[in-house]
């Protein structure tokens, strides 16, 4: 029970949430006075777990303390060394913890033709991943955007396979604009986390792409891009991309939510991009505080500090802070 934040309908009301068999079966509004708030869980919309130097299971143990309940992970770093077996390891390891990991099929293994790599993943192997691993929701970031623009048959074959299986395609196109960007986006590339200016982000939004606003350990575009969120919140998500362990222990997506509020972003809009949009975009099995949804939510102390009191995934308390 608590003050329930209905992000989708932009309202806050006191109420009780009833959970059974991992799902919310009933939400009852009442007139009680509560000190705490209940919100949907946070989602990292683009993450390379390898940068944390942790396994998925170990990463999850820290992330849930900050209210993260799910992440969309591109395992192309381990795949560049171990190929398909590396991806399978990440997926299998992620199954060991109560956390909602989703993965992409890496499109850039090797990343460039000049790279000394340990593996190659072609379109046929991408298709095998889509067929055999339901955790894989998307074709991983298409980093070689020049290959797309120049209609390289190998990268286009991977994109075609993704569309064949109804999978989204993530992007990676820093600084790309004009006709080249239009051609890149025309292949159904749906996101980009590599924008450095608001102008660049808005051009991509106008072409139908979603912008993943990033603040990680390696690159930080959050402060530059977050002002677009009040108007374009429906087309934004939050991500860390790369998160080193010393930064992860300090905070995760929760820190970006607080930073967004301080920057003047409306409460419901910052929660929309932190909690709701990744679920809708990637079709994730993550609850959004609605009846019949999975019981994935956070109990927090207030709407300023966002201190996480409990993190709940599939109706189970996976972390609790005094």
What do these predicted regions represent?
Residues 1-30:
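N-terminal metal-binding scaffold of metallo-dependent hydrolase/deaminase domains
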């Amino acid at each position: 029970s608590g003050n329930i934040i209905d992000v989708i309908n932009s309202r806050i009301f006191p109420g009780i949430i009833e959970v059974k068999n991992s799902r919310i079966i009933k939400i009852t509004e009442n007139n009680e006075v509560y000190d705490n708030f209940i919100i949907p869980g946070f989602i990292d919309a683009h993450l390379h777990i390898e940068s944390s130097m942790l396994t998925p299971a170990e990463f999850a143990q820290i992330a849930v303390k900050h209210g993260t309940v799910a992440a969309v992970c591109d395992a192309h770093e381990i795949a560049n060394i171990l190929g398909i077996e590396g991806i399978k390891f990440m997926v299998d390891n992620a199954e060991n913890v109560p956390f909602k990991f989703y993965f992409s099929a890496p499109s850039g293994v090797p990343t460039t033709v000049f790279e000394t790599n340990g593996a190659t993943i072609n379109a046929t192997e991408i298709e095998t991943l889509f067929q055999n691993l339901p955790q894989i929701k998307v074709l991983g970031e298409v980093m070689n955007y020049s290959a797309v623009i120049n209609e390289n048959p190998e990268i286009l074959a991977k994109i075609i396979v993704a569309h064949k299986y109804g999978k989204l395609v993530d992007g990676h196109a820093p600084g790309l604009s004009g006709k080249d960007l239009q051609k890149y986006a025309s292949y159904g590339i749906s996101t980009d986390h590599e924008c450095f200016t608001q102008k660049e982000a808005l051009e991509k939004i106008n072409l139908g792409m979603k912008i993943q606003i990033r603040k990680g350990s390696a690159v930080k575009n959050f402060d530059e891009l977050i002002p677009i969120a009040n108007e374009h919140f429906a087309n934004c998500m939050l991500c860390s991309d790369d998160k080193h362990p010393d930064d992860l222990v300090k905070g995760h997506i929760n820190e970006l939510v607080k930073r967004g509020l301080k920057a003047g972003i409306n409460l419901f809009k910052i929660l929309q991009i932190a909690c709701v949009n990744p679920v809708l975009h990637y079709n994730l099995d993550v609850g959004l505080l609605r009846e019949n949804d999975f019981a994935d939510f956070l109990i927090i102390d207030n709407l300023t500090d966002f201190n996480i009191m409990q993190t709940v995934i599939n109706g189970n308390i996976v972390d609790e802070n005094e």
